[in-house]
A protein has these predicted regions:
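Acidic catalytic loop of the alpha/beta-hydrolase fold
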Residues: 122-128, 155
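Short beta-strand/loop motif that positions the catalytic acidic residue
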Residues: 111, 117-120
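Alpha/beta-hydrolase-fold serine-hydrolase catalytic core, especially in secreted/extracellular enzymes
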Residues: 140-146, 151-317
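Extracellular/periplasmic catalytic domains that process cell-envelope and extracellular macromolecules
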Residues: 17-22, 61-62, 85, 109-112, ...
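Short alpha-helix in the alpha/beta-hydrolase fold that links the catalytic acid
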Residues: 7-9, 127-137, 245-248
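Active-site machinery of serine-nucleophile hydrolases
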Residues: 1-58
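Primarily recognizes the serine-hydrolase "nucleophile elbow" in alpha/beta-hydrolase
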Residues: 65-112
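Stable alpha-helical elements in mature extracytoplasmic
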Residues: 45-52, 75-82, 86, 130-134, ...
Length: 317
C-alpha cells in the first residue's frame, strides 16, 4: 500500500513516487490484528484509523481540508465503511477492489458530500455487480462518484490509474461548514458529524458488528441546518443528547446565537462569546487548526435517559 503511493526507497533512502511529487504525506495504518483476514466493522478498527489521523494533524502541517481515505482489498472495505461513518473528515474516498458491505448499504446517504473514486477489475468476482446497490444509489442521487472499471482485469491494485487519481484529488476539497446535512448512524461510535455530536441512540437503532444484521433495526437519522441569516443552528435528532460546536466561519458571535433541537428553542446563556478554553480543548482533541470551534452547547433532548444520568442514578441506589 505504501509503495503504491510513494514508490520504493532509492539507494539514498528517499522515495520519489507520485505522492511526494504531488506534495502528499502518505500514512499506512496497521489496523489488522494478528491472523485477521477481513475487515470487521469494529470500534477498534475505526479508532486505529482515526487516532492516526489525529496524531498526524498534531505533529505535521496538514491541510485538513485535503485529507483522502483510501485502501486496497480489505483495506478498501475498511476505507469505505469508515469514510461513510465519518464523512466530515475526508476530502475524498478511494476504495480499490473493495466491497461496500454491511453498514455501507445503510449509510449510503452519508456520502452525499463525500467524493468517491472507485476502482475495480471487470473479472474480479463480479465486484461491480456486488457493489451495485450502493453505487446505483450514489449515481441516482447525483453524488460525486467516479467509477473506473478495467476490462479484462481482475483482483489487482491498478497502479496505472495513479496519475488520474492525483489529478482527481487536486480538484477536491472538503467543505467543513455545509449549510445542511443529513446522516444515519447505527453504531455508538459513529456519533460526530461536522458541527454536531450525538449521544444515546434509540435502542432500535443500535446494531453492533457482531449482531449484524438485526431485523427491524432502523438507522437513527440526524439532520442539521446552519442558518447564518438568523444566526441559528438547527438539528433534528432521535438521540438523548446533542452537542453543538460553533466556529467563527459559521455564525456571528457579536449577535445572540439561536439553537433549535427538534423544533424547540434551547435556552442558552447570554454570553455565547468565544471561549479560549473550548478553543484549546477542541484543537487538542481534533487537531484541526484550520477549522477550530470557539464555543459549544450541550443539551438533553428528553428522548432518552443519557448514560451519565443512568450512572448517577445507579450509584445513588
Amino acid at each position: 500500500e505504501m509503495e503504491w503511493w510513494t514508490g520504493s526507497f532509492n539507494p539514498k533512502g528517499f522515495r520519489y513516487g507520485q505522492a511526494g511529487r504531488n506534495g502528499y504525506i502518505v500514512i499506512s495504518v496497521d489496523w489488522m490484528n494478528k491472523d485477521q483476514r477481513e475487515y470487521e466493522y469494529s470500534a477498534r478498527e475505526h479508532a486505529a484509523v482515526l487516532n492516526v489521523l489525529h496524531h498526524v494533524t498534531q505533529r505535521f502541517s496538514i491541510d485538513t481540508d485535503r485529507v483522502f481515505l483510501s485502501g486496497h482489498f480489505e483495506g478498501g472495505d475498511a476505507a469505505w465503511d469508515i469514510g461513510c461513518a465519518h464523512p466530515d473528515l475526508w476530502a475524498g474516498l478511494i476504495p480499490i477492489s473493495a466491497h461496500a458491505d454491511k453498514y455501507c448499504n445503510l449509510y449510503w446517504s452519508n456520502a452525499r458530500r463525500l467524493p468517491i473514486y472507485f476502482i475495480c477489475g471487470a473479472l474480479d468476482n463480479q465486484i461491480l455487480s456486488r457493489n451495485s446497490n450502493v453505487l446505483s444509489r450514489y449515481s441516482l442521487h447525483g453524488y460525486d462518484l467516479t467509477v473506473a472499471e478495467f476490462l479484462g482485469r481482475g483482483h489487482e491494485p491498478f497502479s496505472d490509474e495513479l496519475l488520474r487519481l492525483f489529478d482527481w484529488m487536486e480538484r477536491k476539497k472538503r467543505n467543513f461548514y455545509p449549510e445542511k446535512f443529513e446522516v444515519r448512524t447505527m453504531r455508538p461510535w459513529d456519533d460526530f458529524f461536522w458541527w454536531v455530536d450525538v449521544e444515546t441512540l434509540p435502542p432500535n437503532s443500535i446494531v453492533l458488528p457482531a449482531q449484524f444484521p438485526v431485523r427491524g433495526a432502523i438507522p437513527a437519522k440526524i439532520s442539521a441546518e446552519l442558518i447564518p441569516s438568523v444566526n441559528t443552528l438547527k438539528v433534528n435528532v432521535p438521540t438523548g443528547k446533542v452537542t453543538f460546536w460553533v466556529g467563527p466561519s459559521m455564525l456571528d458571535f457579536e449577535q445572540p446565537i439561536n439553537f433549535l433541537v427538534n423544533g424547540k428553542k434551547v435556552r442558552v446563556p447570554r454570553d455565547t462569546k468565544p471561549d479560549l478554553r473550548i478553543l484549546l480543548e477542541d484543537v487538542r482533541t481534533r487537531g484541526d487548526r484550520q477549522n477550530p470551534f470557539w464555543q459549544k452547547l450541550e443539551t438533553e433532548t428528553g428522548k432518552f435517559e443519557t448514560s451519565r444520568k443512568r450512572k448517577n442514578n445507579s450509584s445513588g441506589n
